[in-house]
Amino acid sequence: MARIIALDGAQGEGGGQILRSALSLSMITGQPFEMSGIRAGRAKPGLLRQHLTAVRAATEICGAQVNGDELGSQQLRFTPGPIRGGEYRFAIGSAGSCMLVLQTVLPALWFADGSSRVEVHGGTHNQAAPSADFICRVWEPLLARMGISQRTTLIKHGFYPAGGGAAATVVEPATSLRGLTLISRGETLRTTAEALLAAVPYHVGEREVATLEAHFPQAEKNVVALEGGCGPGNALSLMIQSEQLTELFVAFGVKGTSAEAVANQVAHEARRYLASPAAVGEHLADQLILPLALAGEGAFTVARASAHLLTNIAVVERFLPVTFNLEEARGMVQVMVSKKDSGS
């Protein structure tokens, strides 16, 4: 029987990413794991609905044996079986992030025995999670360059706290994974400001994009009033398309926060990204660790190595025979991954 990997959910930033990465890697490598202290670093520790949905989705896709899969649980034991392609549908039952559930199971389906379609119902535009737009416009184009055939479609927008959204991804097994090198982003080609409004007055979006335009006069502007009963909700994004990649910065309107304050938050994040010579933003850096590790090669630059990034690297190195090296130079950090020496 494979050795059980023991993981401390309180390590590093102590959030749900440790669990999601462990589930992905366990399915792919066939190595079981035990985790204690799940989300110990959070105000409400243990499994929330979104995390529980990710566990149950992983369980269904690989026929795993699992203990501890209940709301509030801080311990989990997961013993995977073979990954099975097919049609899957999961409902979070709250506004928890569809994207984080998808990102847990999709890497395993890159290695499935056939094509798959995964549909998840819940939140599509959440704070502290990649939005559906980020997945479609930023992450998946980079995966395609690595040889991964995956396409996500936003079925319906879902905002916190109501949820009610849905997204579906069609994924084909990858024949092989290529590394990716993102050292410089190159020249900025296009900038687009977009406000999404669901049961929120149109003038809110107009004020948001007008404020962003003051920071980025060259930005194209787009205000989208969503229909179909989703909401209330408001998301403002700034998409920066460069020669080597696309980045997306998002902030969410909340009661008591002005449209101008939301726009200034997006502008601050985007300006901080553009002020650094690094190619990759802080959140995208987190999303690249797992695919690059599975490819066994690659490199990118990021302005700083966040606790989230370092925690994710530590988990990946427990499951895969790879080594990450981080080097600081010229006001940024270069992250490199390589396969471990077979003799080491």
From Swiss-Prot:
Catalytic activity annotation: a 3'-end 3'-phospho-ribonucleotide-RNA + ATP = a 3'-end 2',3'-cyclophospho-ribonucleotide-RNA + AMP + diphosphate
GO annotations of cellular component type: cytoplasm
UniProt keywords, alphabetically: ATP-binding, Cytoplasm, Ligase, Nucleotide-binding
Annotated catalytic residues: H308 (tele-amp-histidine intermediate)
Keyword Iron-sulfur tagged: no
Protein name: RNA 3'-terminal phosphate cyclase
Compartments reported by the entry: Cytoplasm
Enzyme class: ligase
EC code: 6.5.1.4
Species this chain originates from: Salmonella paratyphi C (strain RKS4594)
Pfam assignment, any one: RTC
Binding site for ATP: Q103, H283, L284, A285, D286, Q287
Gene Ontology terms: biological process: RNA processing
Main location per the UniProt record: cytoplasm
One Gene Ontology MF term: RNA-3'-phosphate cyclase activity
Alphabetical list of SUPFAM superfamilies matching this protein: EPT/RTPC-like, RNA 3'-terminal phosphate cyclase, RPTC, insert domain
Gene3D superfamilies the UniProt entry points to: RNA 3'-terminal phosphate cyclase domain, RNA 3'-terminal phosphate cyclase, insert domain
Family classification: Belongs to the RNA 3'-terminal cyclase family. Type 1 subfamily.
Task of the protein: Catalyzes the conversion of 3'-phosphate to a 2',3'-cyclic phosphodiester at the end of RNA. The mechanism of action of the enzyme occurs in 3 steps: (A) adenylation of the enzyme by ATP; (B) transfer of adenylate to an RNA-N3'P to produce RNA-N3'PP5'A; (C) and attack of the adjacent 2'-hydroxyl on the 3'-phosphorus in the diester linkage to produce the cyclic end product. The biological role of this enzyme is unknown but it is likely to function in some aspects of cellular RNA processing.
InterPro entries: RNA3'-term_phos_cycl_insert, RNA3'_phos_cyclase_dom, RNA3'_phos_cyclase_dom_sf, RNA3'_term_phos_cyc, RNA3'_term_phos_cyc_type_1, RNA3'P_cycl/enolpyr_Trfase_a/b, RPTC_insert
